[in-house]
């Protein structure tokens, strides 16, 4: 399908999303006490941007997604899709689509009927239903499978159908709730790349929820790290990995070795840190909040930044374990 056909058939109503001071409080049924799931979050997602909410279980990422979709209403705050505050508007009036972890396909409908379902509910003309459904079937490489049923497809094919059903209604925002977690590792990687390529082609504003760090790094324009209902840090995947704002972020994204030291001051864009009686100049272009001169600090050193040598180096060490991964050995 040509780029012109894609743009004319799909994704022409994309809008940005803005969250202003969003809070969600649940009452715990056993104790009756309030539980703050999301605590005064502010987030701005640009039109056409792919943003991932990433964090451990219980951090509030899925609740945030559900408040944007309309499946949960915020206790306080505003949810803007484009220029409209939709915080109290039901899901079917928001112009969004959602791709679920479970696919949620109708088992009694064939693939073509599953994809066309949303258009028929919206009372789109039959000619338009046929045109748009056929266009998205071709786009998602489902041509030839129109008369099959969901139980006759593989997991990856079912996920393509779920995605086709989501984009065919031309949503202003596309939401993903851990859509690849039911797939095996190899297929998950393939579908991840396919999904990202589709989003970039169509330019639909997208919010993706996952707890898989590598998935978030691979598909996102921007990653938002959450913990305990608040945003810890947001930035491009490279910014998050290379300039983590806290020990939690450094440890959650990739792997890191943590080394305690004494902060001796700054030298331009570098921090002077004393470790084991020796002073090292460490690249530190960002802010160092809460760190005082001659006070304790912590360095996060990525495994790939450490070079092993039999010759004497600035820091002595001992190899305690080596793990073979095929393409690499991790010490």
Task: Please place each PLM-identified region on the residue numbering.
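Glycine/charge-rich catalytic "coupling/switch" loops of P-loop NTPases
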Residues: 3, 242, 270-323
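ABC ATPase nucleotide-binding domains
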Residues: 91-97, 101-251
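ABC-family P-loop ATPase nucleotide-binding domain
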Residues: 1-25, 33, 311-314
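Helix-to-loop junction immediately C-terminal to a conserved catalytic motif
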Residues: 69
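Conserved coupling/switch loops of ABC nucleotide-binding domains, chiefly the family-specific signature
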Residues: 75-78, 128, 228, 260
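Conserved beta-strand
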Residues: 19-22, 36-46, 77
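Conserved ABC transporter NBD signature motif
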Residues: 77-85
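The feature captures the beta-strand-to-loop junction immediately N-terminal to the Walker
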Residues: 54-56
């Amino acid at each position: 399908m040509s780029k012109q056909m894609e743009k004319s058939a799909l994704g022409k109503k994309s809008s940005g999303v803005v969250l202003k001071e969003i809070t969600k409080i649940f009452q715990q049924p056993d104790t009756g006490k309030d539980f703050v799931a999301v605590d005064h979050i502010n987030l701005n997602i640009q039109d056409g941007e792919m943003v991932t909410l990433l964090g451990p279980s219980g951090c509030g990422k899925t609740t945030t997604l559900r408040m944007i979709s309309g499946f949960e209403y915020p206790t306080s705050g505003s949810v803007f899709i484009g220029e409209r505050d939709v915080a109290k508007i039901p899901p079917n009036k928001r112009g969004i689509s959602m791709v679920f972890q479970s696919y949620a396909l109708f088992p009694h409908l064939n693939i073509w009927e599953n994809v066309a379902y949303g258009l028929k509910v919206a009372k789109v003309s039959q000619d338009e239903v046929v045109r748009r459904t056929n266009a998205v079937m071709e786009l998602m490489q489902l041509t030839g499978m129109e008369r099959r049923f969901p139980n006759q497809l593989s997991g990856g094919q079912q996920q393509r159908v779920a995605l086709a059903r989501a984009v065919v209604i031309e949503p202003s925002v596309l939401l993903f709730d851990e859509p690849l977690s039911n797939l095996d590792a190899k297929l998950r990687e393939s579908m991840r790349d396919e999904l990202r390529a589709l989003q970039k082609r169509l330019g639909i504003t997208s919010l993706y929820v996952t707890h898989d760090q590598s998935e978030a790094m691979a598909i996102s324009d921007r990653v938002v790290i959450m913990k305990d209902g608040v945003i810890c840090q947001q930035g491009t995947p490279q910014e998050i990995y290379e300039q983590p704002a806290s020990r939690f972020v450094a440890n959650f994204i990739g792997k890191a070795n943590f080394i305690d030291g004494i902060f001796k001051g700054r030298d331009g864009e570098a921090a002077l840190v004393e470790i084991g009686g020796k002073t090292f100049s460490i690249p530190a272009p960002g802010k160092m909040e809460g760190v005082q001169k001659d006070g304790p600090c912590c360095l996060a050193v990525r495994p790939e930044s450490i070079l092993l040598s039999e010759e004497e180096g600035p820091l002595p060490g001992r190899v305690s374990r080596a793990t073979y991964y095929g393409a690499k050995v991790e010490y």
